[in-house]
Amino acid sequence: MSKDDLIQFTGTVLELLPNATFRVKLENDHIIIAHTSGRMRKNRIRILLGDKVTVEMTPYDLTKGRVIHRH
């Protein structure tokens, strides 16, 4: 699967979970579990409750995603 196959959504962080994982409410009112991308971990970008984030998801599993940007 290439990068072109990934779907991006904007959402809001609802809950902070262990191991850099978050419960995110997307703009289409779906709630998913998302983890922090490797570059965000490497650069120590903090994500807090209520932050607007961009989430990248695969079309095969629409319940999990990866946070790639914090607004």
Curated annotation (Swiss-Prot):
PROSITE patterns: S1_IF1_TYPE. It is found in: Cytoplasm. Its main location: cytoplasm. GO terms for cellular component: cytosol. Pfam families: eIF-1a. GO terms for molecular function: ribosome binding; rRNA binding; translation initiation factor activity. Residues 1-71 form the S1-like domain. Keywords: Cytoplasm, Initiation factor, Protein biosynthesis, RNA-binding, rRNA-binding. InterPro entries: NA-bd_OB-fold, RNA-binding_domain_S1_IF1, TIF_IF1. Belongs to the IF-1 family. HAMAP family: IF_1. Component of the 30S ribosomal translation pre-initiation complex which assembles on the 30S ribosome in the order IF-2 and IF-3, IF-1 and N-formylmethionyl-tRNA(fMet); mRNA recruitment can occur at any time during PIC assembly. One of the essential components for the initiation of protein synthesis. Stabilizes the binding of IF-2 and IF-3 on the 30S subunit to which N-formylmethionyl-tRNA(fMet) subsequently binds. Helps modulate mRNA selection, yielding the 30S pre-initiation complex (PIC). Upon addition of the 50S ribosomal subunit IF-1, IF-2 and IF-3 are released leaving the mature 70S translation initiation complex. NCBIfam families: infA (TIGR00008). This is Translation initiation factor IF-1. It comes from Rickettsia prowazekii (strain Madrid E).
